[in-house]
């Protein structure tokens, strides 16, 4: 999909960027790769997830990641630590996993309790096992287009755009949000794909005017339906990385009702970005296992 085709997209004909369907398709490919690793090395790719405390939402996310591992034949090592865990104790556990040759990827579930230095703990993860793309070194290497595992949500979004043959070069992209694991890496990945990128945030003046000129809009700000449908430029590609539970299921950071009559393509909520985030984590763990085995 080129700039010209985006501009000429007929009303009501927006492509649904179905992350759930694509993730299922990729899982079949990953299962084959996992089987090949087992056959050639006698070892099973494994992802270690660390959950500190008893936050219900975090526990749900960790369980979903474990289920995804199981579906492709990987091992899932679940490490649970109490809320009172110190930064030093958590870093020691990460070191233990770094030094375990049977662990190919490490995920520290965000957020950790407030008294823990989360950034220091992220930085403790060995770059070769940073399959969630959370280290500063990994971010820097990605930004400089060197080999590294990308932060999973933006990397999953890029996979989704690539799958739908959306040509990014030359597009005006607006990323709303500047978090270390979503907004900033998303902007850098789009820049590396030759987009002209604007990052908006809580201090941005006149957000609407920025959205109205964007060929690609990425909602990554964590505020329910902050970005209104009538701000969207005709033919734009709309990516909603937010999720906020409601009585009717959930909404994202973008008001999606009516977007199908404006955009050329958009991600549904749920079923768009979320499945691709977990899928990318699993894919990058398989990549790490193959590299570890020299395959």
Curated annotation (Swiss-Prot):
Catalytic activity: (6R)-5,10-methylene-5,6,7,8-tetrahydrofolate + NADP(+) = (6R)-5,10-methenyltetrahydrofolate + NADPH; (6R)-5,10-methenyltetrahydrofolate + H2O = (6R)-10-formyltetrahydrofolate + H(+)
Pathway the protein takes part in: One-carbon metabolism; tetrahydrofolate interconversion
Keyword annotations of the record: Amino-acid biosynthesis, Histidine biosynthesis, Hydrolase, Methionine biosynthesis, Multifunctional enzyme, NADP, One-carbon metabolism, Oxidoreductase, Purine biosynthesis
Entries under InterPro entries matching the protein: Aminoacid_DH-like_N_sf, NAD(P)-bd_dom_sf, THF_DH/CycHdrlase, THF_DH/CycHdrlase_cat_dom, THF_DH/CycHdrlase_CS, THF_DH/CycHdrlase_NAD-bd_dom
Pfam families listed in its UniProt record: THF_DHG_CYH, THF_DHG_CYH_C
The keyword Transport is annotated on this UniProt entry: no
Gene3D superfamilies reported for this sequence: Leucine Dehydrogenase, chain A, domain 1 (3.40.50.10860), NAD(P)-binding Rossmann-like Domain (3.40.50.720)
Functional description taken from the UniProt entry: Catalyzes the oxidation of 5,10-methylenetetrahydrofolate to 5,10-methenyltetrahydrofolate and then the hydrolysis of 5,10-methenyltetrahydrofolate to 10-formyltetrahydrofolate.
Name the record gives this protein: Bifunctional protein FolD
Gene transcribed to yield this protein: folD
